[in-house]
């Protein structure tokens, strides 16, 4: 800058400069009489900054020190935000997770739900009590008859009726078959997500046999609409109880094969032990139920504590975990399958003869044979299936021990043939709320294992 100032003081051709590398002073010769422009002090100050066209913002910029002594400024490192699902095969339906990752460590896990919302609770308000029943098959579409059982018990409580003993035993029988269906799906797809393919193929063969039992008793493989207010739709066909007995006799061997594949498998233990730990306190605070609660060491099973139908007449044990991790919950589900086999065999041995519907013509439709001969029965059938039956005003909360946890139905009647309000309490909703707590600090791959152990189905979460 000092050299520029000295240069600007010189005028005209008398200005002389030193050519680099030579000691000879040469006069500056203006070309064709034109005066040669030289940068002055103002120009150098204006354009000598950080940018070519400075502004107020750039005026405050200071050049960094050109050495390695001064430490660089601390910079903020932001975590990676990742979308998991909803099209991911391990998302078990339409789960979308917005995860915050630090490297491969999960810092935050935010579930976004509602992608399978169908407005079930509102639709039920526009249907009769019988027409509302099939909606429950489509909530937790892996354990269909358990959902029907909860709704039927709620309607029966409002009607103040009790189904005959045979109907109650059939309900318990198929409730435990449904529990087997659900736990096979839960355990094998959990293993499939982690990378064990064999149990999935082995156990789904058994699952197919149980779907055949569904089909023989109701005509449908999945959405049965078999358990109805007042009893069940129709009696067991001939030979079905023998086939269920043969199935249950051999099914414990299939469970042994499943445990042989997984229980002491080194890779399975590495992927599940100490993953997704839930303490007993957290399980209660989050409102967990079912295996998610029992895996943490709390022995709570509505079939024992608040028995419904004929669960007070069957003997079974309630398995609980000790650590509250994925491995304990897996062991609980496997043991529950063994206990379900015990209950099924007791149901087959204690199945009484008799009616399968309540003896109340205002609730139960007449038999097909009567409709063919009696005009009054035909009219009665028509009125029941078009207008439905009136339910006395009242409200009830009825809960059962569904395979995933406590499935509750809060039913309000205003005295008409349609429910005034039907609120459904799904166990998977509370479990999904605890996903952030369970997955924090784990690796990204462990989130898949945690979703699998929660046994989430989005039909009931989104409703």
From Swiss-Prot:
NCBIfam families: NuoD, PRK06075.1. Dimethylation at Arg-118 by NDUFAF7 takes place after NDUFS2 assembles into the complex I, leading to stabilize the early intermediate complex. One of its GO terms (cellular component) is mitochondrial inner membrane. This is NADH dehydrogenase [ubiquinone] iron-sulfur protein 2, mitochondrial. Its main location: mitochondrion. Keywords: 4Fe-4S, Acetylation, Electron transport, Iron, Iron-sulfur, Membrane, Metal-binding, Methylation, Mitochondrion, Mitochondrion inner membrane, NAD, Oxidoreductase, Respiratory chain, Transit peptide, Translocase, Transport, Ubiquinone. Its EC number is 7.1.1.2. The lineage of its organism: Eukaryota, Metazoa, Chordata, Craniata, Vertebrata. The gene is NDUFS2.
